[in-house]
Amino acid sequence: MYKKDSIDGRQKRGIYILPNLFTSASLFCGFYAVVASFQGRFLSAAIAILISFIFDGMDGRVARLTGTTSKFGVEYDSLADLVAFGVAPAILAFTWGLSGFGRLGWLAAFLYVATTALRLARFNVLSHSGVSSKSYFLGLPCPAAAAMVATTVLMAQHLGIVGPVRHFSVLIMIYVLSFLMVSSVRYPSFKDSKWLQRRPFTSMVGFILAFMILAIQPKVTLFWVSAIYVATGPVLLTIRLFSPIKSKVSTTTRSPKAVVSNREDQKDEH
């Protein structure tokens, strides 16, 4: 009896450790990316950040599937995210394209780290208070911003982009990503699986096509996927801002015949 209880206890502790192992793997990849950046192995650093992105997406799902979510795991995940998606991309961007700007370059890298920390703090506060939404993120998620930095390095090396074009592009990108992370721009979270459940066949075909495209041109595909997601927030915001104006214009520019017919319909209803 005692032996059985001890075995069950070890199993429970093992399941509890399992999601934190994925978090630790994400943290390790982020730290490795920092080391690789200082050694000038920028391609390895970018790949490490993308692998960290995968591990970060798995730890929460494993915790929910095994029923081992905890406050410790949430806090540990946030600290790991700060290293993997804050410090590591900032160091990569600085050593790869910002070091030539001097003070302006390292200030941009620091701004990226600071806004990542602020983004994570706000996310934790909203999650604990229960006011966060499952359908969207408030501000650009820091893993998506880190993926944008990493895939930019991959894309630039794929195209052979060097010189001032690369340096100024990285500088502008870091400032834009920093702003988007602490902004109130909404980004889709893709946590709602109702659409996948309603159209399983279409979803399966889409995943197969995406995998084929990724296998053919992984660097190009990952870059455009990251860039499209980063642009999704401002595009959706623009649509929401102009949609009321468009509806007002459509109601005020109706033809006189439509107005007369509408009035006649209202009379008939009375």
What are these regions (language model features)?
Residues F28, I54, M58, V62, ...:
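Active-site His/Glu-centered metal-binding helix of metallohydrolases
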Residues Y32-I47, V83, V87-A109, T151-S169, ...:
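Helix-coil boundary and interhelical linker segments in multi-pass alpha-helical membrane proteins
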